[in-house]
Amino acid sequence: MEKKKEVRALAKYVKMSAHKVRRVINQIRGRSYEEALISLEFLPYRACYPLLQLVSSAAANANNNLGLKKDTLLISEAKVDEASVSKRFQPRAQGRAYSIQKDTCHITIKIRERSK
């Protein structure tokens, strides 16, 4: 039994909530590399830009490290995990302060060769 070749790319501490990235990543999971690029270019979400960079990086890793062609690649796994939260304070009226949480996330993309 031949082991499937798989490469991954990670983006850590992306300054965006995991909930917003999951909305986009659910639409590219299981798609081919070209379909994912087209989807990410035309979706109107801010999360598309770091995902586009990450998918391109994973494809470059597959091409350079394993010699796989980009037209045969498939996104086999795509996940988002919550990372640390930075806490800030917003000054308000009468000496009060509201806390603001700045969320970050870790994004993992795994790409493998499409089975024929």
From Swiss-Prot:
This is Large ribosomal subunit protein uL22c. This protein binds specifically to 23S rRNA. GO terms for molecular function: rRNA binding; structural constituent of ribosome. The keyword Cell inner membrane does not apply. GO terms for cellular component: chloroplast; large ribosomal subunit. The gene is rpl22. Keywords: Chloroplast, Plastid, Ribonucleoprotein, Ribosomal protein, RNA-binding, rRNA-binding. Part of the 50S ribosomal subunit. GO terms for biological process: translation. InterPro entries: Ribosomal_uL22, Ribosomal_uL22_bac/chlpt-type, Ribosomal_uL22_bac/org-type, Ribosomal_uL22_CS, Ribosomal_uL22_sf. Gene3D superfamilies: Ribosomal protein L22/L17 (3.90.470.10). Belongs to the universal ribosomal protein uL22 family. The keyword rRNA-binding applies.
